[in-house]
């Protein structure tokens, strides 16, 4: 075990040339980031999760009810043993051939069977009230952590001149505010990693999981080798648009369409400006070029920058999706459902007739009535 730890914490990988871990031990004069500091993130992540449960129950839910957001779920599918067996044991999305077979077996029309499967799938979806509470929690946290980051960074020299991220590196003392900011962010992303498995399931689950994982790696990496100064710039930039998105979701759930549209436009502008403009031109410029000039490259420097480039790749992907929904918004006149939406269709869009005999109605091969579908957005949908 000692050999494995020695290999993992190899100074030639983690630190610049001619720097050792002994040089970064805490002294009476200065405190530096220590790897063991990060253990604090785990109990704090649990505390954040518990605070979230309390917040959603006693603050977000009353707010949702005050806005007339009901807890009613989607329409319940009519009990049917045959269809239930197919749904649970075979497929939740029957193809056209199976639909025709079930239609003959039950003497139902195909459209009624499609509706049954859609309603049955939607039974497992959370209510609008649940979505509102989840978004209100994220809005509150993102707003707080972004506000804290701005208040902290405006007092630092590296906000105004990024070369200060590398002067005297890695012998840069760790301040209490920087330590709190880092541990809070790391704890929140650990809580997201866990809660993602219990939250509303979205189609880009894998992408978001990769995003959270990359963020945790970045925070951990930059803390351990004391790249925390530039790390605070990355964190604050990537927090800047999140509160606007969650606010747009809340407006959408409350059916304040004009407010939703305005907030989404504000989110899109801030997101694209910060992640496609400021981040590469300001942050990547300092991590790739200014640090090379002042400190020089070393193995963990390459890994850190590769993680930042991975994050930028996700930013480009999400920006493309945001532009796509923005174009559709212009053509349709309002923000609509998107590809991350966990709702396949609204029961209000369907005929409410009960399953009956077959008057073969027109259907599409994908099992919808031809009017349901998804519009794409970015890292989080407006209607998810």
Curated annotation (Swiss-Prot):
What is the protein's known function?
Ceramide synthase that catalyzes the transfer of the acyl chain from acyl-CoA to a sphingoid base, with high selectivity toward palmitoyl-CoA (hexadecanoyl-CoA; C16:0-CoA). Can use other acyl donors, but with less efficiency. N-acylates sphinganine and sphingosine bases to form dihydroceramides and ceramides in de novo synthesis and salvage pathways, respectively. Ceramides generated by CERS6 play a role in inflammatory response. Acts as a regulator of metabolism and hepatic lipid accumulation.
The record's gene field reads: Cers6
Documented EC number(s): 2.3.1.-, 2.3.1.291
Q: Mind listing the UniProt keywords for this protein, alphabetically?
A: Acetylation, Endoplasmic reticulum, Glycoprotein, Inflammatory response, Lipid biosynthesis, Lipid metabolism, Membrane, Phosphoprotein, Transferase, Transmembrane, Transmembrane helix
User: Which residues, renumbered to this chain, are glycosylated?
Assistant: 18
Q: Known catalysed reaction(s)?
A: a sphingoid base + hexadecanoyl-CoA = an N-hexadecanoyl-sphingoid base + CoA + H(+); sphinganine + hexadecanoyl-CoA = N-hexadecanoylsphinganine + CoA + H(+); hexadecasphinganine + hexadecanoyl-CoA = N-hexadecanoylhexadecasphinganine + CoA + H(+); sphing-4-enine + hexadecanoyl-CoA = N-hexadecanoylsphing-4-enine + CoA + H(+)
Q: Where in the cell is it found?
A: Endoplasmic reticulum membrane
Q: Mind telling me which residues the site (Not glycosylated) is annotated on? A: 285
Bilayer topology term: Multi-pass membrane protein
Q: What is the reported tissue distribution?
A: Broadly expressed, with highest levels in kidney and brain (at protein level).
Report the enzyme's class at the first EC level.
Answer: transferase
Q: What Gene Ontology molecular function terms does this protein carry?
A: DNA binding; sphingosine N-acyltransferase activity
Q: What the entry says about post-translational processing?
A: N-glycosylated. Glycosylation on Asn-18 is not necessary for function. Acetylated. Deacetylation by SIRT3 increases enzyme activity and promotes mitochondrial ceramide accumulation.
Give the source species.
Mus musculus (Mouse)
BP-aspect Gene Ontology terms: ceramide biosynthetic process; inflammatory response; sphingolipid biosynthetic process
Q: Where is this region: Homeobox-like?
A: 66-127
Give, as in the UniProt entry, the pathway in which the protein acts: Lipid metabolism; sphingolipid metabolism
Name of this protein:
Ceramide synthase 6
Which spans does this entry mark as compositional bias, Low complexity?
A: 361-373
Q: Where is the TLC domain?
A: 130-331
Topological domains on the Cytoplasmic side lie at 324-384
InterPro entries reported for this sequence: HD, Homeodomain-like_sf, Lag1/Lac1-like, TLC-dom
Q: Which Pfam families match?
A: Homeodomain (PF00046), TRAM_LAG1_CLN8 (PF03798)
- Give positions of region: Disordered: 335-384
Q: Where are the transmembrane segments?
A: 35-55, 174-194, 205-225, 263-283, 303-323
């Amino acid at each position: 075990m000692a050999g494995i730890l020695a290999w993992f914490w190899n100074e030639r990988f983690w630190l610049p040339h001619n720097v050792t871990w002994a040089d970064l031990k805490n002294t009476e004069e200065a405190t530096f980031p220590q790897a063991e500091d990060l253990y604090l993130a785990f109990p704090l992540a649990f505390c954040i999760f518990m605070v979230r449960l309390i917040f959603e129950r006693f603050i977000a839910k009353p707010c949702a009810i005050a806005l007339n957001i009901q807890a009613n779920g989607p329409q319940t599918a009519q009990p049917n043993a045959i269809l239930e067996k197919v749904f649970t044991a075979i497929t939740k999305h029957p193809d056209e051939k199976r639909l025709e077979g079930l239609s003959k077996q039950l003497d139902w029309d195909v459209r009624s069977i499609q509706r049954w499967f859609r309603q049955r799938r939607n039974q497992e979806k959370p209510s609008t009230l649940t979505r509102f509470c989840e978004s209100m929690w994220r809005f509150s946290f993102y707003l707080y952590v972004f506000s804290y980051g701005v208040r902290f960074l405006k007092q630092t020299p590296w906000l105004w001149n990024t070369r200060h991220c590398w002067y005297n590196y890695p012998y840069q003392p760790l301040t209490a505010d920087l330590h709190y900011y880092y541990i809070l962010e790391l704890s929140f992303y650990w809580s997201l990693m866990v809660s993602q498995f219990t939250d509303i399931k979205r189609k880009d689950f894998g992408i978001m999981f990769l995003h959270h994982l990359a963020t945790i790696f970045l925070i951990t990496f930059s803390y351990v080798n004391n790249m925390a100064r530039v790390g605070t710039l990355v964190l604050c930039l990537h927090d800047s648009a999140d509160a606007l998105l969650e606010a747009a979701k809340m407006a959408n759930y409350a059916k304040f369409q004009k407010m939703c549209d305005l907030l989404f436009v504000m989110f899109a502008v801030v997101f694209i400006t910060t992640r496609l403009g400021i981040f590469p031109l300001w942050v990547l410029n300092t991590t790739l070029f200014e640090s090379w000039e002042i400190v020089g490259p070393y193995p963990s420097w390459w890994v850190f920058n590769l993680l930042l480039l991975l994050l930028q790749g996700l930013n480009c992907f999400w920006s493309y999706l945001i532009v796509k929904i923005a174009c559709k918004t212009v053509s349709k006149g309002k923000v609509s459902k998107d590809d991350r939406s966990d709702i396949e269709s609204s029961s209000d869009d369907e005929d409410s007739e009960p399953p009956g005999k077959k008057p073969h109605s027109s259907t599409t091969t994908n099992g919808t009535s031809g009017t349901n579908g998804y519009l794409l957005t970015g890292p989080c949908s407006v209607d998810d």
